[in-house]
Amino acid sequence: MNYIQTKCLFLYKFQALKTILSNEQLQLTIQRLSHQLIENHFPFTDTVFIGLQPRGVFLADRIVAAIQAIYPEKKLEYGVLDITFYRDDVHKELHVANQTTIKFNIENKNVVLIDDVLYTGRTIRAGMDALLDFGRAAKVELCVLIDRRF
């Protein structure tokens, strides 16, 4: 394979990334998700928010910050959950574990799991398995930025 064939193969395999949401659309979506959580869970007495490592944490940080900006007097319980060793593909390749930080009790609480994308549900299943190590929640809800469907 010469240089031209190699270059074409490289360009074929690695296409330019497509922008799904602009910065403005992303901010609007985060505000919309935050307001939906306020509508469903206010005054947050029995609700906790948990961002799934690694990419769900970025979304969770923004959602929790947006809610705190609207209700600065409310103390939201927010944690971060690493699901690395709960995944069904953990033995297939090397995975680096991230930190789990849950400094509150989830027993009989409404848990909102926050992640970036829902596709097959494997990440969410792993998150729910990992969550069981912290107690039995009354209810678990999912908040995602993008639902890829099928």
Where are these regions (language model features)?
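PRPP-associated nucleotide enzymes
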Residues: M1-F150
